[in-house]
């Protein structure tokens, strides 16, 4: 079972809302091993609670609308107070942690990495503003997971 779970979420068809998907995809290509599970999804839902409860750390990566576009913030989150109303079709990180704790007896340490988006209109590419901060988001996530950055591959010489 993975010790770390990274969940990148948002709408991959709404420009900067895809930052969680992009980060999850790039980290998935860079990291290997049984100690990390990486998930890209449209939204958080109660069905994720069991997998979350089986980890030591969960990292959420999402877009937000408040602040200056391209701003990256990090905050630790705690489980919300549990109530049956939390069991809706989609959750915020605090509610997902509450479900994990209530249903499976454990809520791991949790961190949200949020990137302020510039555009949430229809589109499949990040804006240049958000694209520029993606490497920093990946570095922050790897640091939280205690995973070093991948080494650059040496360029092939063609003669």
Where are the predicted features?
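Short "lid" loop at the C-terminus of a central beta-strand within the Rossmann-like core
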Residues: 118
């Amino acid at each position: 079972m993975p010790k770390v779970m990274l969940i990148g979420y948002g709408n991959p068809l709404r420009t900067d809302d895809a930052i969680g998907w992009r980060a999850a995809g790039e980290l998935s290509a860079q990291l290997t091993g049984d100690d990390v599970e990486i998930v890209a999804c449209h939204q958080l839902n109660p069905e994720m609670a069991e997998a979350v409860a089986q980890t030591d750390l969960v990292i959420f990566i999402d877009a937000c609308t408040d602040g200056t576009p391209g701003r990256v913030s990090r905050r630790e989150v705690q489980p919300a107070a549990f109530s049956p109303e939390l069991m809706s079709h989609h959750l915020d990180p605090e509610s997902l942690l509450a479900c994990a704790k209530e249903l499976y007896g454990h809520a791991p340490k949790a961190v949200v990495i949020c990137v302020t988006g510039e555009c949430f209109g229809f589109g499949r590419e990040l804006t240049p503003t958000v694209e520029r901060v993606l490497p920093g988001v990946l570095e922050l996530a790897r640091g939280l997971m205690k995973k070093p950055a991948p080494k650059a591959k040496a360029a092939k010489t063609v003669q």
